[in-house]
Amino acid sequence: MKNNFDINDFNDSEVWDLICEGRTKGVFQLESNLGKHWAKEVAPRNIIELAATISLIRPGTLKAKDEKTKKSMTQLYAFRKAGNTDYPVEYLHESLEPILKETYGVLVYQEQSMKIAQQLAGFNLKEADDLRKAIGKKKADLMEEIKKKFVKGTQEQGTVSQKAAEEIFSWIEKSSRYAFNKSHAVAYAINAYWSAYCKTHRLKRFYKTYLNRSDKKPKSEIEIKQLIMDAKSAGIEVYPPRLSRLQTDFELDDNKNLIYFGLRHVKGVGTKECEKIETLEDVSEYSWMDCITKVIHPLKINKRAAIAMISVGAFSGKNNKESRRKMLYEFDSWKQLSAREQSAIVENQKEPSTRSKTLADAVGVLIENTKINSRRMETVINVQNSLKNPFYDLEDHAVSIATQEAKLLGCSLTCSKVDDAQVATDYCEDVAKGLKKKKISLAVVINSIRVVKTRNGKNPGQEMAFLSVEDNSGELESVTIFPETYAEYKNVLLEENTVMLFCEPSKKEKGSVIVNKAMQI
């Protein structure tokens, strides 16, 4: 780990490797799937190239097409930077080379338009700035006025012919749909570099910080899931809340590659409940009865928060091995008791002579030692009977645990929905790292599916799909299903469905697979 660094030094090769490999979740301006993709495609190795990358992945640039190649300006830049001989660097006029050389002949910035106007048409700084404003504000009437001045200026300067001047200005005018402010782009690139630096050299702290700020995002549960999956791919596990680690925020294990989930980020557990929990001393050795009588009842943990905490395993620990389903069942039974009856059980638990190991026994002691009026007695006896003879199976199952954790934590941490189906031979984590096998079988949950129509091939217009899937080892984001396969199995290829995928590795991209067959689990 680097403890000292120069704020103006942008030459850390490990940081650039991280960006170029598309490991950019949490990296400023590059954390979207679009950012990851183009970071790999463009492969920037310095701040100037990173500034261009950030500018080029804006919607306008991606939509703008080069008239000659019909490629987007973003793709054209990437091809030219990579030295693709099918897309050589070209300039409308030789005088543009010094201005556009650093962006491989692609007009990326508003400042480039200003320089062109100054050098070719003799614009002063104010006139060039008027051009920049017209580009930024997309004012057609102002652009027309400046065009006349530009063409006239080139003729007076004798730099290019009138036809070339009109062509160049037309090019500048089209750039108004996407050209970005370079000073902003460089500032963004510097921020992106330093966030990537933190991810490279302060990995655990990076994830802890970003996870604790996930609630600032519009869809915090999606942000949490993406960060946790990204952390897994980097070798860092995130554990759900537990009795030994009941804390408000995400916290690090200083000795292991572990981060513990913060209660504040559990859906249904508010800040007030967290503040109550923080007042507790060591509860790591509490039993389930202790949790009821020493935590939930005395702290007045509200019902919604208690159910959420039970459902994600927050009350599980060294001396509480009860299933979550059983704890939820018994908590529901506890809530059927009156406040007076609950308080009586709490008091009984303080005395060795009346202390019980189970809630069923505690209710029995309540019936024997406490005066209960006739109207309540039937209810209390029914509660005791239901505790002794539950109405349904109280064992935990992978599907139910994973479903509840996904709902309340943002993703499943203890297990996956497919853990009960011991049929897969491969895991997402290994495949994402580039496992080379002829045949791959994955038992997965489908996180997302994007259906598109083919443009080329024998039968253009057919549907194909791109999936993001996961199992308990991690996430696999690059899963491709071609038209013929998608048409056959589309009925099981649904978001949140659990399926078996039979695949082969893609020859084009490491960590990517092509699906040949899908089967419902």
Where is each model-derived feature located?
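Noncatalytic, beta-rich nucleic-acid-contacting surfaces in large DNA/RNA-processing enzymes
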Residues: 1-521
